[in-house]
């Protein structure tokens, strides 16, 4: 394989640029040419494809976001979109593709491989919700950004004797909430993976104020549960009498210079993705498990270790969905006594 391409797709995540840099420089060291694709699969279909060299990725390792831009392009799920993208790949002499993104991005990589264009997926999302890896690129940075913000909110919360509900991203996964909540000393953490009793949450706030001598209370809420405003309304309906404020950290968690950990795992996975393509392997996703590099088939059976399977009706299902560490939820409860 002499010429490959790299793209980023879906939501941006700190560390994507580090992964792009690794793909480009590793490929060049192996005697391969690299092309960048702007705006993910949308750019592939539009032919927004251009050469990338070492100079183009210089000084990118410390930058957040993705300099290749990103976009969601549901049309690529259809055969017409796939064939249009493949036509552009052929036009530019591209033989393989590295795809950095989440589940939807992996589905595109799977389709490319089926059409004879080996594609390798790299997990890039702050949500840390992709099967086949313990950590995704961007997660560590997002957690650190959340902790910094919660630490600052604690200052104002304690100054005014208030309760703060801090909503964090994560889609349907509670990883950011759990890790940031523990690291910031949150009083309560609410995640989608665990049922909660709103009346117990309210009574815990009251008990902390009246019997523990606390003058403030921090609740970290994963967005997959409900919005912070809706949660606050339910708290009041459950009898909470505290001076309550809501802060949604929102997209700030996607930005910022990536942490050292995100830069390292992005570089590690990007380099390995190139090695796989060099060997002509596609339809695989790179990941980290027990601090070691792993690779999994994107499509296949659960017994084969594949991330996704197809039902008889042609529906894509996740074989081993990512699960947040609920032992961390128990840990935080024991530490917030």
UniProtKB/Swiss-Prot annotation:
User: What InterPro entries has UniProt attached to this entry?
Assistant: ATP_PFK, ATP_PFK_prok-type, PFKA_ATP_prok, Phosphofructokinase_CS, Phosphofructokinase_dom, PKF_sf
Primary localization class, coarse: cytoplasm
GO cellular component terms, semicolon-separated: 6-phosphofructokinase complex
What family is it from? Belongs to the phosphofructokinase type A (PFKA) family. ATP-dependent PFK group I subfamily. Prokaryotic clade 'B1' sub-subfamily.
Which metal ions or organic cofactors does this protein require, according to UniProt? Mg(2+)
Which Pfam family would be a valid example here? PFK
Q: Where does substrate bind?
A: 125-127, 162, 169-171, 223, 245, 251-254
What does the UniProt keyword field contain?
Allosteric enzyme, ATP-binding, Cytoplasm, Glycolysis, Kinase, Magnesium, Metal-binding, Nucleotide-binding, Transferase
What does this protein do, in the record's words?
Catalyzes the phosphorylation of D-fructose 6-phosphate to fructose 1,6-bisphosphate by ATP, the first committing step of glycolysis.
Active-site residue list? 127
Domain of life according to the entry: Bacteria
Q: Which Gene3D superfamilies match?
A: 3.40.50.450, Phosphofructokinase domain (3.40.50.460)
List where in the cell it is found: Cytoplasm
Q: Which reaction does it catalyse?
A: beta-D-fructose 6-phosphate + ATP = beta-D-fructose 1,6-bisphosphate + ADP + H(+)
The metabolic or biological pathway listed in the UniProt record of this protein is:
Carbohydrate degradation; glycolysis; D-glyceraldehyde 3-phosphate and glycerone phosphate from D-glucose: step 3/4
Residues annotated as binding Mg(2+): 103
Q: Name one GO biological process term.
A: fructose 6-phosphate metabolic process
- Per its UniProt entry, what is the enzyme's top EC class, as one word? transferase
The residues that hold ATP are: 11, 72-73, 102-105
Q: What molecular function does GO assign, one term?
A: identical protein binding
| EC number assigned by the record | 2.7.1.11
How this chain assembles, per its entry, is: Homotetramer.
Q: What is this protein called?
A: ATP-dependent 6-phosphofructokinase
PROSITE patterns attached to this UniProt entry: PHOSPHOFRUCTOKINASE
- What is the scientific name of the source organism? Streptococcus pyogenes serotype M1
Which residues of the sequence carry a binding annotation for ADP?
A: 21-25, 154, 185-187, 212, 214-216
